[in-house]
């Protein structure tokens, strides 16, 4: 299911905050997000279950939790405004929902950067079937 969602996004073109999130990750980590994070571990990409495999996968778990806490927002499609100031992401705009989505994406991009040294290639295309069915709580 996760793979189909990612392929659909790639075929249709990325819109809204997904494109902005991709740009944040690329700038913070130097990695191409679709290749490096779209299928990483048990939580990166669409959906997630089980225990995060490592610190990078935990970044995705926390990001999913952040999105879950947003009410009345469409975090994958609502575009937001942000800028870079002295190497830091600054979320802007007047819409509180869009600003919160930006803050979730910002936190994840920073988390990916901070955990680059623990990134494991073996989790890049980790099969969902190997993730346990019982998920951690946010």
From Swiss-Prot:
Annotated disulfide bonds: 42-131, 44-60, 59-111, 65-138, 66-104, 73-97, 91-102
Keyword Signal: yes
SUPFAM superfamilies xref list: Phospholipase A2, PLA2
A Pfam family that the UniProt record links to this protein: Phospholip_A2_1
A GO cellular component annotation in the UniProt record: extracellular region
Tissue: Expressed by the venom gland.
Cofactor, free-text remark: Binds 1 Ca(2+) ion.
Co-factor(s): Ca(2+)
Binding annotation for Ca(2+): 43, 45, 47, 64
InterPro entries the record matches: PLipase_A2 (IPR001211), PLipase_A2_Asp_AS (IPR033112), PLipase_A2_dom (IPR016090), PLipase_A2_dom_sf (IPR036444), PLipase_A2_His_AS (IPR033113)
Keywords on record: Blood coagulation cascade inhibiting toxin, Calcium, Disulfide bond, Hemostasis impairing toxin, Hydrolase, Lipid degradation, Lipid metabolism, Metal-binding, Secreted, Signal, Toxin
Subcellular localization: Secreted
Active site: 63, 105
Enzyme Commission number(s) of this protein: 3.1.1.4
GO MF annotations in UniProt: calcium ion binding; calcium-dependent phospholipase A2 activity; phospholipid binding; toxin activity
Residues making up the signal peptide according to the UniProt record: 1-16
Keyword Disulfide bond: yes
Reaction catalysed by this enzyme: a 1,2-diacyl-sn-glycero-3-phosphocholine + H2O = a 1-acyl-sn-glycero-3-phosphocholine + a fatty acid + H(+)
Function comment: Snake venom phospholipase A2 (PLA2) that shows potent hemolytic activity, and exhibits medium anticoagulant effects by binding to factor Xa (F10) and inhibiting the prothrombinase activity (IC(50) is 90 nM). It is one of the few phospholipases A2 capable of hydrolyzing the phospholipids of E.coli membranes in the presence of a bactericidal/permeability-increasing protein (BPI) of neutrophils. PLA2 catalyzes the calcium-dependent hydrolysis of the 2-acyl groups in 3-sn-phosphoglycerides.
Family listed: Belongs to the phospholipase A2 family. Group II subfamily. D49 sub-subfamily.
Entries under PANTHER family matching the protein: PHOSPHOLIPASE A2 FAMILY MEMBER (PTHR11716), PHOSPHOLIPASE A2, MEMBRANE ASSOCIATED (PTHR11716:SF9)
Protein name: Basic phospholipase A2 B
Upper classification of the organism: Eukaryota, Metazoa, Chordata, Craniata, Vertebrata
